Amino acid sequence: MATKVKFKYKGEEKEVDISKIKKVWRVGKMISFTYDDNGKTGRGAVSEKDAPKELLEKLK
């Protein structure tokens, strides 16, 4: 089963499959990322404590 990352962006609850995530970086205690949103680049962020371990592994 594919891991999903749940996050809020501009007040809207969103969820993205971890396989669509392109780039991951740390900003303080937040993990920011970009993902493929049907051909467009989407952005998201999640707190480090709420991030799935698969997302944290992409930081390395």
From Swiss-Prot:
The GO terms describing molecular function are:
DNA binding; RNA endonuclease activity
What task does this protein carry out? Can constrain negative DNA supercoils. May be involved in maintaining the integrity of the genome at high temperature.
InterPro entries given for it? Answer: Chromo-like_dom_sf, DNA-bd_7a-e_arc
Superkingdom of the organism of origin: Archaea
Q: Where in the cell is it found?
A: Cytoplasm
pH-activity relationship: Highly stable from pH 0 to pH 12.
- Cellular component terms, GO, for this chain's entry? cytoplasm
Write out the entry's keywords from A to Z. Answer: Cytoplasm, DNA-binding
Region of interest: Disordered: 37-60
* Protein known as: DNA-binding protein 7c
Give the main location. cytoplasm
On temperature dependence, the record says: Hyperthermostable.
The record's family statement is:
Belongs to the 7 kDa DNA-binding/endoribonuclease P2 family.
According to the record's subunit comment, the protein's assembly and interactions are: Monomer.
